[in-house]
């Protein structure tokens, strides 16, 4: 049996207006582009790094 991949749910809580282009691109990479959007992503070090980069714009809802 294969192990189920861990996932993490992230919600965008603040706008990307007047933010650096790299932060906007990071939000798009996280499948977020509007306030209130929720994305379920694989829990990898890369994803964690992207969340850390825009931690002031998003919140982690659930880790499974």
Swiss-Prot record:
Region span, Disordered: 1-22
Keyword Ribosomal protein attached: yes
GO cellular component: cytosolic large ribosomal subunit
One annotated GO molecular function: structural constituent of ribosome
Keywords for this protein: Ribonucleoprotein, Ribosomal protein
Superkingdom of origin organism: Bacteria
Pfam families associated with the record: Ribosomal_L30
GO biological process terms held by the UniProt record: translation
Keyword Cell inner membrane: no
CDD domains the record matches: Ribosomal_L30
Assembly description: Part of the 50S ribosomal subunit.
Family: Belongs to the universal ribosomal protein uL30 family.
NCBIfam families reported for this sequence: rpmD_bact
Protein name: Large ribosomal subunit protein uL30
